[in-house]
């Protein structure tokens, strides 16, 4: 690992509400989140040195988007680093932002992401392009197929109960009813018994809900300039790791740290977590709130295991023992998770967790507020866990 010249701090952020108008272009979405984040941070646009921006390349018609993004945001001639790597790409964009600041080259960087619902091709037609196309397209596999196979193996290998999955979904929905930014905020609260049922309807309710088009932005600065903008800065660190793009290679891939695992574990997330914890200077015992990117309840429990909160196969024990609640040592998914906050792909899947932990540390979360929140961790993934990202925020005052 190279030399880090200074710490990186977060001083503001914003996300668009669910169900923004379908006639908004990606330019409108991106500008909305960008300017709201700058306003939240108290940063004039002239102070921004760089924007790192991720987008869903399958959902916009524009190629070479860097100068187009800079023009839409009103920052020309300042540079934009465009990133496209599926749902967790903002983790990479934030990694770019982090490095620009930690190296001393930039003082103020905005990490921005947006996702517009596919306007040109249906999800079913485009989804295989996010996988290993040479194999998966010919086999007809999509992310949804992968998720079903992964969940089935995880359930059988570790004897995971429907009760645990239903309980996961219940608490995600409980938090979402206390988060005005969540997709399910104003919807009726489901019953635990219904979520634990062995029915197709319950299975669907244990999976992510769609958020529609979404954009979000976060403002990062160097530790030495943070006090210029706020008296409550929050430390930010991030790491990511890759796994083979073809899911057939998820079984005992012959490299260190992966050969002992199969599709029922997340070794890429384990690697990203180790690096993120090291850079942030924390141990897993220091963490007191976690937000995970969960497209299914089972995947959420797998993420807890990969982060080291519990042993492999013991995620269900943590959930059933009340580990997700505000009374636990480390509450989980207080923003509502993918199941109830909503899946936002490149527009929010990484950012939503960072923003929630940031707002929790600032004490701005109302009924879902975690007591004495100091260290928050979040996860995100892309292309069926061939990319895994971990973010860490810590109280900095």
Residues covered by each model-derived region:
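Condensing-enzyme catalytic core mediating Claisen C-C bond formation in acyl metabolism
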Residues: 1-27, 132-133, 167, 198-267, ...
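Short glycine/threonine-rich loop-to-helix capping motif typified by GTGT followed
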Residues: 59-68, 246-252, 294-317, 345, ...
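C-terminal catalytic subdomain
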Residues: 257-318, 329-334, 351, 355, ...
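Generic structural signal for well-ordered, non-membrane alpha-helical segments
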Residues: 23-30, 34, 62, 66, ...
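Conserved active-site "lid/cap" helical segment
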Residues: 1-88, 96, 154-161, 183-184, ...
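Beta-strand segments within the central parallel beta-sheet cores of soluble alpha/beta enzyme folds
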Residues: 10-11, 45-54, 79-85, 109-114, ...
């Amino acid at each position: 690992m190279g030399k880090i010249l200074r710490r990186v701090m977060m001083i503001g952020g914003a996300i668009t509400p669910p169900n923004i108008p379908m006639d908004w272009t990606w330019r409108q979405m991106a500008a909305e989140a960008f300017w709201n984040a700058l306003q939240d941070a108290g940063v004039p646009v002239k102070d921004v040195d760089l924007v790192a921006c991720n987008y869903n390349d399958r959902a916009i018609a524009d190629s070479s988007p860097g100068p187009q993004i800079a023009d839409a945001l009103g920052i020309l001639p300042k540079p934009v680093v465009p990133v496209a790597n599926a749902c967790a790409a903002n983790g990479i964009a934030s990694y770019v932002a982090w490095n620009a600041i930690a190296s001393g080259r930039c003082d103020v960087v905005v990490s921005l992401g947006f996702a517009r619902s596919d306007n040109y091709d249906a999800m079913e037609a485009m989804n295989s392009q996010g996988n290993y196309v040479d194999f998966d397209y010919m086999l007809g596999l999509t992310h949804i197929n992968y998720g079903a196979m992964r969940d089935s193996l995880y359930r059988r290998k570790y004897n995971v109960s429907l009760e645990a999955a239903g309980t996961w979904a219940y608490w995600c929905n409980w938090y979402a009813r206390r988060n005005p930014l969540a997709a399910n905020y104003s919807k009726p609260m489901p019953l635990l018994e219904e979520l634990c049922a062995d029915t197709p309807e319950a299975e669907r309710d244990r999976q992510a809900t769609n958020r529609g088009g979404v954009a979000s932005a976060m403002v990062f600065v160097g530790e030495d300039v943070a006090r210029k903008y706020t008296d409550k800065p929050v430390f930010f660190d991030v790491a990511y790791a890759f796994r083979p793009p073809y899911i057939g290679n998820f079984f005992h891939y012959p490299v260190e740290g992966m050969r002992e695992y199969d599709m029922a574990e997340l070794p890429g997330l384990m690697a990203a977590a180790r690096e993120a914890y090291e850079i942030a200077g924390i141990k897993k015992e220091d963490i007191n709130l976690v937000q995970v990117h969960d497209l299914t309840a089972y995947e959420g429990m797998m993420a807890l295991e990969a982060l080291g909160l519990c042993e492999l196969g013991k995620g269900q024990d943590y959930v059933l023992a009340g580990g997700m609640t505000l009374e636990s040592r480390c509450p989980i998914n207080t923003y509502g998770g993918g199941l109830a906050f909503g899946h936002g792909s490149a527009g929010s899947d990484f950012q939503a967790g960072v923003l929630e932990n940031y707002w929790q540390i600032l004490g701005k979360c109302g009924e879902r507020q975690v007591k004495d929140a100091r260290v928050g961790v979040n996860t995100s993934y892309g292309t069926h866990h061939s990319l895994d990202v971990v973010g860490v925020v810590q109280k900095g005052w």
